[in-house]
UniProtKB/Swiss-Prot annotation:
HAMAP family: HMP_PP_phosphat. Coiled coil: none annotated. This is HMP-PP phosphatase. It comes from Escherichia coli O1:K1 / APEC. One of its GO terms (molecular function) is magnesium ion binding. The keyword Transcription does not apply. It catalyses: 4-amino-2-methyl-5-(diphosphooxymethyl)pyrimidine + H2O = 4-amino-2-methyl-5-(phosphooxymethyl)pyrimidine + phosphate + H(+). Its cofactor is Mg(2+). Pfam families: Hydrolase_3. Keywords: Hydrolase, Magnesium, Metal-binding.
């Protein structure tokens, strides 16, 4: 039996309205009763996730910022990874041919250059929000990641520009079809989960994980049991064709699968 369960949030554990369903919360509690370690592995900020855990009284480890930070149950920082200052400077100061909005993250929060109220819909559950700044005056030290949000085709063209400018000095990935992230080299949820399992004296074979986007690829591909959401990005399913696909996040599919796993571990599972 798995000893640790790692969950992506958006498109996986969260429903399309960006809330955690009651069935999901009940199932997470059942996992804790079985002494299975919970880990939330997300692109969201540690400040937001710590607020959510506190509101729900959930004991869980946190992998946040797509692997840039790992925190213990008590909130102790176990691992950090930042963009090199010269990489952050290039991304912030370069004139990119894109309509996408730019978002910068550090330990103090989420920063952007103008109001984009539509983006806050994804944060109704926690109330977390951006701070408006002049991005050219952003301190370059300790930037965890930089994101671009916009149309997928536009972001795909931007990805080419970024790679041509940065080469191997950063890791580029789509955390959603409308979000392209610039991360430190070697930084991803899978690498962060490796750090956490070593801290806990576990192996990746002891873990199960659930996800829906390309920022989940390394995590899903490295654990003993990886599961892809039915609403996942097609690119993820193509990258990991050997992994089972469960149901849609709107139906709380993670809870559906785990309830079966807890109650009928020896019977085959169907997402229907």
């Amino acid at each position: 039996m798995a000893r640790l369960a790692a969950f992506d949030m958006d498109g996986t554990l969260l429903m399309p309205d960006h809330h955690l369903g009651e069935k999901t919360l009940s199932t997470l509690a059942r996992l804790r009763e079985r002494d299975i370690t919970l880990t939330f592995a997300t692109g969201r900020h540690a400040l937001e996730m710590q607020h959510i855990l506190g509101a729900l009284s959930l004991d869980a480890y946190l992998i946040t910022g797509n692997g840039t930070r790992v925190h213990s149950l008590e909130g102790e920082l176990l691992h950090r990874d930042d963009l090199p200052a010269d990489v952050a400077e290039l991304v912030l100061y370069q004139q990119w041919d894109t309509r996408a909005s730019m978002h910068i993250f550090n330990d103090d929060g989420w920063f952007t250059g103008k109001e984009i109220p539509a983006l806050l819909q994804a944060f109704v559950y926690s109330g977390f929000r951006y701070q408006i700044i002049d991005v050219k005056k952003m301190p370059l030290g300790s930037v965890t990641k930089i994101c671009f949000c916009g149309d997928h085709d536009d972001l795909t063209r931007l990805q080419i520009q970024l790679y041509e400018a940065l080469g191997e000095r950063a890791h580029l990935c789509f955390s959603a079809t409308d979000c392209l992230e610039v991360l430190p080299v070697g930084c991803n949820k899978g690498a962060a989960l490796t750090v956490l399992t070593q801290h806990l004296g576990l192996s990746l074979r002891d873990c199960m994980a659930f996800g829906d986007a390309m920022n989940d690829r390394e995590m899903l591909g490295s654990v003993g049991s990886g599961f892809i959401m039915g609403n996942a990005m097609p690119q993820l399913r193509a990258e990991l064709p050997h992994l089972p696909v469960i149901g849609h996040c709107r139906n709380q599919a993670v809870s559906h699968y785990l309830t079966h796993w807890l109650d009928y571990p020896h019977l085959p599972y169907s997402p229907e």
